[in-house]
């Protein structure tokens, strides 16, 4: 086992604070409308330019191991804030640095670290309740666009595009961000349910100009099995032909004789048919087939529940207004399923989202909710160069996360004003003893830090602006972009409550642990092994020769 280097008390805390400051100082230059960019060197390819706090934090590793421990703990604050709300990483880092700096001063002055932590925790719990009281719902497109604009560093086009996407696919719809091919940003919206499976034979195509199969008011047969024998399907095909409607078959696979017969029937015009593979694999395929059944009002023909294809009737088939199938995707538009059944299915999947343990499972379940409840929108980010593309895509993703958080928990006045108002309201808060009261004051003083940093990045004097804002009330604050005072809500400067709340909670959590640190242990650097060069060995041999 490697030997360890151990530091105690003030020595440990000074080293830790130095690491905290290196990381936080690099991250906080990005805060606010006049925040600057940070350039990150990459081992290959062009450097990355970013204004995303967590991207900067992730790149920082320090040579001194004690300082690095401090930096890594603050990095955890940024990562946690990013995971919880998708934004607010820079605010969280600024808050953490402020609490740690003030807290360690109090420890150095002889305060009890555990009581300080209890005071900080008490202040944060009270502050979270105050934030919830200040929060107003964010439901209209204008407010959503404003939140997106602020989070995308005052880029109005991004805010408007996100608001438009939410309008089209609903609050529950999936909105994804991709790299575009042109210079302009584009918004693609897919209404209805789309899954990544295309036609099984190009002979089904009835729109040669688009290379797609388009069927109006089709029946939809859902089968959780491979279909290779056409005899199994004859009763359904005959019933559909009599009804004079097209048929879409979604099955595990359609192959051999069955596929050939369907192609021949389609080409002769006896019955319009198209076959696609069911989406997903294993249990996920069963679940997605059930989703399609709920959406279209059909039944999944599965031998597991005692249903056979030969005995299927028109009542077992789903229906939709339109189905479009191309080489890679199938889109079902306006399924005829009952609204109550669809909502029930959505609620069931949401419950699974709550219980999911892996991010991958959670993402797939949320996609299923979106496909049932709304639709899918894709924002394609346009830029002139690869470097600009990456920077812009990161901003759009942040803005999207912020707008989702705003819809979820509402918004408060932005620009650091909400935390200043909360701190003012809690000025009379007290705890069990004087050391805990100092902890409360540490947390309340730290709540001014985001406002001060925004002002500092804008090139103004933080103390002057902070005192002017504190003298006002309600949503009165400082617009760093235009350098004027006024109502932040009227300026359209809004922060999602969830983002501000998460930033404060995670910052206080890690800062409290760091203030109560008394000892730090790390591996000693390995010294290079002594060089047993050839010359030494030869010298020995020479000596032996002399003895002879």
Swiss-Prot record:
Its EC number is 5.6.1.7. GO terms for cellular component: cytoplasm. It is found in: Cytoplasm. GO terms for molecular function: ATP binding; ATP-dependent protein folding chaperone; isomerase activity; unfolded protein binding. One of its GO terms (biological process) is protein refolding. Keywords: ATP-binding, Chaperone, Cytoplasm, Isomerase, Nucleotide-binding. Pfam families: Cpn60_TCP1. It catalyses: ATP + H2O + a folded polypeptide = ADP + phosphate + an unfolded polypeptide. Disulfide bonds: none annotated. ATP binds at residues 30-33, 51, 87-91, 415, 479-481, 495. InterPro entries: Chaperonin_Cpn60_CS, Cpn60/GroEL, Cpn60/GroEL/TCP-1, GroEL-like_apical_dom_sf, GROEL-like_equatorial_sf, TCP-1-like_intermed_sf. Transmembrane segments: none annotated. Together with its co-chaperonin GroES, plays an essential role in assisting protein folding. The GroEL-GroES system forms a nano-cage that allows encapsulation of the non-native substrate proteins and provides a physical environment optimized to promote and accelerate protein folding. Belongs to the chaperonin (HSP60) family. Forms a cylinder of 14 subunits composed of two heptameric rings stacked back-to-back. Interacts with the co-chaperonin GroES. This is Chaperonin GroEL. It comes from Pectobacterium carotovorum subsp. carotovorum (strain PC1).
């Amino acid at each position: 086992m490697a030997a360890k280097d151990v530091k105690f008390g003030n020595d440990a805390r000074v080293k830790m604070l130095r690491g905290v400051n290196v990381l936080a100082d690099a991250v906080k230059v990005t805060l606010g409308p006049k925040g600057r960019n940070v350039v990150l060197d990459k081992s290959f390819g062009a450097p990355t330019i970013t204004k995303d706090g967590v991207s900067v934090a992730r790149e920082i590793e320090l040579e001194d191991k004690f300082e690095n421990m401090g930096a890594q703990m603050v990095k955890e604050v940024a990562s946690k804030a990013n995971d919880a709300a998708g934004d607010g990483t820079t605010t969280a880092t600024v808050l953490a640095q402020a609490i740690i700096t003030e807290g360690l001063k109090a420890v150095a002055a002889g305060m009890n670290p555990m009581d300080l932590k209890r005071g900080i925790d008490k202040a944060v719990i009270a502050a979270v309740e105050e934030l919830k009281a200040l929060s107003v719902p964010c439901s209209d497109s204008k407010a959503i666009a404003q939140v997106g604009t602020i989070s995308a560093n005052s880029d109005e086009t991004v805010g408007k595009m996100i608001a438009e996407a939410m309008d089209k696919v609903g609050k529950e719809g999936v909105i994804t961000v991709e790299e575009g091919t042109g210079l302009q940003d584009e918004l693609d919206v897919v209404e209805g349910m789309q899954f990544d499976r295309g036609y099984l034979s190009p002979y089904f195509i009835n729109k040669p100009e688009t290379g797609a199969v388009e069927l109006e008011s089709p029946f939809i047969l859902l089968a959780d099995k491979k279909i290779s024998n056409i005899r199994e399907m004859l009763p359904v095909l005959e019933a559909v032909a009599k009804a004079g409607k097209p048929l879409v078959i979604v099955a595990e696979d359609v192959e051999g004789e069955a596929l050939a017969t369907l192609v021949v029937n389609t080409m002769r015009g006896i019955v319009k048919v198209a076959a696609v593979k069911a989406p997903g694999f294993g249990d996920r395929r069963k679940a997605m087939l059930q989703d399609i059944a709920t959406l279209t009002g059909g039944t999944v023909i599965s031998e597991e529940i005692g249903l056979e294809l030969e005995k299927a009737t028109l009542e077992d088939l789903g229906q939709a207004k339109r189905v479009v199938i191309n080489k890679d995707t199938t889109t079902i538009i306006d399924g005829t399923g009952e609204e109550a059944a669809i909502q029930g299915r959505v609620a069931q999947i949401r419950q699974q989202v709550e219980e999911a343990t892996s991010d991958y499972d959670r993402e797939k379940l949320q996609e299923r909710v979106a496909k049932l409840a709304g639709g899918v929108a894709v924002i394609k980010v346009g830029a002139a160069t690869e470097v600009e593309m990456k920077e812009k895509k990161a901003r759009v993703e942040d803005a999207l996360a912020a707008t989702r958080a705003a819809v979820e928990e509402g918004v408060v006045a932005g620009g650091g004003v909400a935390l200043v108002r909360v701190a003012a309201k809690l000025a009379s808060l007290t705890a069990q003893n004087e050391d805990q009261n100092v902890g409360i004051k540490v947390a309340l003083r730290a709540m001014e830090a985001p406002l001060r940093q925004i002002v500092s990045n804008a090139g103004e004097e933080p103390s002057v602006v902070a005192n002017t804002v504190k003298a006002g009330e309600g949503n009165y604050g400082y617009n760093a972009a235009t350098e004027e005072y006024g109502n932040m809500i009227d300026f359209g400067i809004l922060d999602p409550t969830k983002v501000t709340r998460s930033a404060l909670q995670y910052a206080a959590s890690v800062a409290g642990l760091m203030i109560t640190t008394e000892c730090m242990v790390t591996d000693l650097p390995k010294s290079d092994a002594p060089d047993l060069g050839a010359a030494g060995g030869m010298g020995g041999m020479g000596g032996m020769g002399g003895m002879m």
